[in-house]
């Protein structure tokens, strides 16, 4: 009794929180016998917390609370009271089996409360157990006061407005009291509780917040722990480095001369010419088209070997050795490496398709044109000449032997499929060997009129001035016209 009075001179002041009226009367009688005084009695945990938080609250030294009221309240009553008011909370338990008290989600919350409880007393209260309760309360109050001393808090509050001599407050230390926040959420008729405690918010730094940094920090440690962490981080660092190397790998440039050379030969239509892109060092020559701000383009007929067109061309557009035999210049050698790959020599691995065979034979008539508005040139085969000669031999001889039928207009289009075309000599009734034909270019040379016959040279000096064209669109020689007259 003397020890109890040394700690609590006026007696232990207790506040019961219990909804059972019968149990409350029994507890009041037992506590009065032990010289414990009752301050107030509440039926819910929330009502008891409001009384403790009020300004006119009397000095309460301990709280006896039924654990079922704490479960129904939805928050940890003990933790709030002990943290905010530094008053020990003793739980009252009616039965020994928690499953018989609550069900569902409340069972887990009840187990949590009993696990963290300061002290648990069974109901009904036993006088021998309650006689030693003051010792539990005294020890718990001492622990709560040692954690946050009241004198230290008073000193900090007194010096909160003190400023240093240099005008700053670096010498002032401010300690925040631990805060406890509670949230009660009702969902589907049951209560879900979430407890968030911020006791020491400034103790964690940025390195502890990142698990990766934690591992790297432990990697520097010596001993088996550092070796284990290093072996765990090594595969991750290798995979990260390998992925970075793949991302930084540079792709092949599409401006390469080799790619431009081979891409133009792929999927080329049979009706389109082959377009070969050459470096800008080439100067525009015959058969080349120049486009502004672009490399010159060489248009080649499909199937024509590249070497046949580029013979004598160098990287600088001047005359030089064939591409097939590059000199010591590095640019020429590099150009030969690409051009030789495009050469259509029917070699294995050639990039160009073989030449397309001609759809016509050399004995069929061919109509070729050169330039715009030029006269078509007709080439007649030997079989057709023989047929014309046979027809002329059987034809009757008339007075106008040297007169030819009406000619088609020169500018009229020629259709090969509608009729057979004959040469001018066949229509005039002259032999092929007498008057030579003009070449495909329409220009006759001086030597083309000198024909050897029987070892003698017969000179022909035929001029267009001797040929006149009358109104009937017929040709006549001046000598014949004079003889007829």
Swiss-Prot record:
Compositional bias ranges of the Polar residues kind: 195-204
This protein's UniProt keywords: Activator, Cytokinin signaling pathway, Phosphoprotein, Two-component regulatory system
GO biological process: cytokinin-activated signaling pathway; phosphorelay signal transduction system
Keyword Phosphoprotein attributed: yes
Phosphoprotein is among the record's keywords: yes
Residue span(s) of domain Response regulatory: 13-138
InterPro entries in UniProt: ARR-like, CheY-like_superfamily, Sig_transdc_resp-reg_receiver
UniProt protein name: Two-component response regulator ORR31
Organism listed in the record: Oryza sativa subsp. japonica (Rice)
Taxonomic lineage of the native organism: Eukaryota, Viridiplantae, Streptophyta, Embryophyta, Tracheophyta
């Amino acid at each position: 009794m003397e020890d109890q009075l040394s700690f609590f001179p006026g007696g232990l002041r207790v506040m019961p929180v219990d909804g059972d009226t019968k149990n409350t009367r029994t507890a009041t009688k037992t506590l009065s016998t032990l010289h414990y005084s009752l301050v107030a009695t509440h039926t819910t945990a929330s009502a008891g917390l409001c009384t403790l938080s009020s300004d006119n609250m009397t000095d309460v030294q301990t709280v006896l609370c039924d654990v079922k009221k704490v479960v129904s309240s939805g928050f940890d009553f003990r933790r709030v009271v002990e943290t905010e008011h530094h008053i020990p909370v003793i739980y009252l338990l009616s039965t020994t089996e928690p499953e018989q008290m609550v069900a569902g989600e409340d069972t887990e919350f009840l187990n949590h409360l009993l696990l963290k409880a300061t002290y648990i007393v069974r109901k009904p209260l036993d006088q021998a157990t309650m006689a030693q309760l003051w010792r539990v309360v005294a020890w718990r109050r001492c622990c709560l006061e040692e954690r946050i001393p009241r004198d230290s808090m008073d000193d900090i509050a007194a010096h909160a407005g003190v400023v240093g001599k240099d005008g700053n407050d670096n010498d002032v230390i401010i300690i925040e009291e631990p805060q406890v926040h509670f949230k009660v959420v009702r969902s589907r008729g049951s209560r879900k509780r979430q407890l968030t405690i911020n006791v020491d918010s400034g103790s964690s730094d940025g390195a502890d917040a990142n698990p990766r940094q934690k591992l790297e920090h432990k990697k520097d440690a010596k001993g088996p722990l550092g070796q284990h962490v290093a072996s765990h981080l090594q595969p991750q660092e290798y995979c990260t480095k390998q992925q970075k190397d793949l991302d930084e790998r540079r792709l092949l440039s599409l401006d390469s001369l080799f790619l431009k050379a081979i891409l133009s030969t792929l999927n080329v239509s049979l009706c389109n010419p082959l377009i070969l892109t050459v470096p800008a060092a080439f100067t525009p020559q015959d058969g080349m088209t120049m486009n502004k701000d672009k490399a010159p383009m060489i248009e080649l007929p499909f199937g024509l070997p590249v070497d046949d067109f580029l013979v004598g061309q160098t990287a600088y557009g001047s005359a030089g050795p064939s591409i097939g035999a590059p000199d010591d210049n590095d640019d020429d050698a590099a150009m030969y490496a690409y051009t030789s790959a495009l050469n259509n020599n029917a070699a294995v691995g050639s990039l160009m398709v073989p030449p397309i065979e001609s759809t016509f034979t050399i004995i069929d008539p061919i109509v070729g044109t050169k330039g715009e508005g030029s006269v078509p040139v007709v080439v007649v085969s030997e079989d057709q000449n023989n047929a014309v000669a046979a027809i002329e031999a059987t034809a009757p001889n008339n007075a106008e032997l040297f007169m030819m039928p009406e000619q088609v207009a020169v500018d009229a289009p020629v259709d090969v499929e509608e009729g057979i075309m004959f040469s001018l000599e066949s229509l005039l009734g002259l032999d092929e060997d007498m008057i030579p034909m003009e070449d495909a270019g329409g220009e006759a040379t001086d030597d083309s009129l000198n024909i050897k016959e029987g070892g003698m040279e017969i000179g022909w000096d035929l001029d267009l001035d001797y040929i006149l064209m009358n109104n009937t669109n017929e040709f006549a020689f001046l000598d014949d016209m004079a003889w007829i007259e």
